[in-house]
A protein has these predicted regions:
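Boundary/entry segment of secreted carbohydrate-active catalytic domains
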Residues: 27-64, 68, 288-290
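Active-site-adjacent "subsite" loops/lids of carbohydrate-active enzymes
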Residues: 38-55, 112-113, 123-166, 305-308
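Aromatic-lined carbohydrate-recognition surfaces of secreted/lumenal glycan-active proteins
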Residues: 49, 121-131, 172, 192-233, ...
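Catalytic domains of carbohydrate-active enzymes, especially glycoside hydrolases
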Residues: 61-86, 165-171, 239-245, 311-318
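Aromatic-lined carbohydrate-binding/catalytic grooves of carbohydrate-active enzymes
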Residues: 73-104, 335
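Glycine-rich, aromatic-flanked loop segments that form ligand/cofactor-binding clefts
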Residues: 74-80, 103-141, 172, 209
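Active-site groove signature of glycoside hydrolases
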Residues: 75-83, 144-146, 155-187
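Substrate-binding cleft of secreted/luminal carbohydrate-active enzymes
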Residues: 243-268, 274, 279-341
Length: 341
């Protein structure tokens, strides 16, 4: 049944792409991995996040194409390994195959040339240490694997090395942290060291082959993060030293302070001001598009527009939009994209 489902999904993906994307030149349809092409710059990019299944949906593809044609987005962030532990393509990494994590849902060697032909900058999103499949295999009960676990390190490094050959412009690591929980305290230095060590290995292996970026909790931008007391183990200074871009997830709904819950502009402003004092690495934030904890009297459209204004006003090097179900209708309204589901 799994093989039949995968075959159907691949057929639908090919059909949707051929139907809803404009014809490309002959060179763009080559099956040769596009990693051999000149590396594109990631500066100033504006994009949306897509799940592997999002690429198989007609309505989502239509919206993405209309936004690209209108010149409002130029970047796609696509799952290559998600927080279920699933690898979205047919991986050759032995452990991915042994675990049954390799789904073969998407054929990036075919899809990437087509998407590049439409002018998209392509970011591969790899979830790292939140991996229920690997956690179960290694005997961890909470769906997470420690960043210091040798098998977790080797496995994720192997996936990253493989992804670097598929033709993406950039590889972005998400959930590159420990599980949240517990108060701020000393005693987490080993966690910071483990994450820094993993990124150093990645940089040494593929840093000259593909642009690298990391997703960070929004609170990592605050000055107190430099004290290294956060149980998640993310340090802005450490992590930014190994990558080309950092993407703090500046979702107002996730903050505890009411002024930030009610102030989408303020969240982005304060995070950018604080973060730029601590790192010279380009900051390209993720902005909230999902409808959660929107302040009374404010529309989701106004909420999104405020985030965008702050990102522009305070020197973000582009920005990315996050909606977990890939429903970007509100965003398209804000951007002035004429599109209807």
């Amino acid at each position: 049944m799994g093989r039949r489902k995968t075959t159907l999904c691949l057929f639908l993906a090919a059909a949707f792409v051929s139907l809803f994307f404009l014809p490309t030149d002959r060179g763009a349809t080559s099956q040769t991995p596009s990693a051999a092409a000149p590396r594109l710059t990631g500066h100033g990019r504006v994009g949306v996040y897509l799940t592997a299944y999002g690429l198989l949906r007609e309505d989502i593809l239509r919206g993405v194409l209309e936004a690209r044609k209108a010149g409002k987005i130029d970047t796609l962030v696509i799952n290559v390994k998600d927080n279920h532990g699933d690898v979205s393509y047919a991986s050759s990494v032995p452990l991915a195959r042994a675990l049954g994590a390799s789904t073969g849902l998407l054929d990036f060697r075919k899809l990437i040339p087509i998407l590049r032909g439409q002018g998209f900058y392509l970011i591969a999103r790899q979830v790292v240490f939140n991996d229920p499949i690997l956690a179960k295999h290694l005997g961890y009960s909470n769906g997470w694997v420690p960043a210091a676990d040798p098998t977790a390190i080797a496995y994720n490094l192997a996936i990253a090395e493989e992804v670097a050959t598929l033709g993406f412009d950039e590889l972005q690591f998400d959930y590159i942290r420990y599980a949240d929980g517990g108060g701020l305290a000393s005693g987490y230095e080993a966690r910071y060291t483990a994450i820094d060590s993993f990124l150093a290995k990645v940089e040494a292996s593929i840093g000259n082959k593909i642009t690298l970026s990391v997703d960070l909790f929004g609170r990592v931008m605050w000055d107190w993060n430099a004290r290294r007391t956060d149980p998640i183990g993310q340090s802005l200074e450490d992590m930014s030293a190994h990558v080309d871009y950092v993407s703090p997830m500046l979702y107002p709904s996730h903050y505890t302070e009411q002024k930030y819950k009610d102030g989408p502009y303020l969240v982005v402003k304060d995070a950018m001001v604080s973060g730029k004092k601590r790192t010279s690495t380009a900051i390209r934030p993720f902005l909230q598009v999902f409808d959660m904890a929107i302040p009374a009297g404010m529309t989701i459209d106004a909420y999104i527009a405020a985030e965008i204004r702050a990102a522009k006003d305070y020197g973000a090097d582009g920005y990315l939009f996050w909606e977990p179900s890939n429903d970007y209708r509100a965003l398209y309204r804000v951007l002035g994209v004429s599109y209807a589901y």
